[in-house]
Amino acid sequence: MKYTMQLISRDELKRKLERKDQFKLVMALGDWQYRAKHIPGSLHFPTLEDARAELAQDDEIVVYCSNSACPASVLAYEYLVRHGYTHVRRYAGGILDWEEAGYPLEGEMVAAKTP
């Protein structure tokens, strides 16, 4: 299957979250990584099959992982597209890019802000 991977920028993703747009933000890493640190509002599924069971094919979906070199979001993107999902985009920068911009994260490894 030939396709062009659809990407979303950090700033566009931030705007979508701020506007509370209707879309599914999916972290494509393991459970321990999700528990440690993720973008607020993210969903996590133990397997890609679980994601397919929970996501509608016409949902707008953004997948991400840890950074631009991480293959997990590429694999999740390709899997969803191959299974008929039509509105999938990849946030290539991932958690590292989000955190470097100073945007909020949630999870057990996120430092608490001091007043």
Task: Provide a role label for each language-model segment.
Residues M1-Y34, E106-P115:
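Flexible, polar/low-complexity N-terminal or interdomain linker segments that lie immediately upstream
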Residues L17, H38, G102:
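Short, flexible helix/strand-to-coil boundary loops that buttress conserved ligand/catalytic motifs
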Residues L43-H44, I61, P104-M109:
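Short, hinge-like loop/turn segments at secondary-structure boundaries
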Residues K16-L17, E49-D58:
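Short amphipathic alpha-helix with an adjacent loop that forms part of the alpha/beta core around
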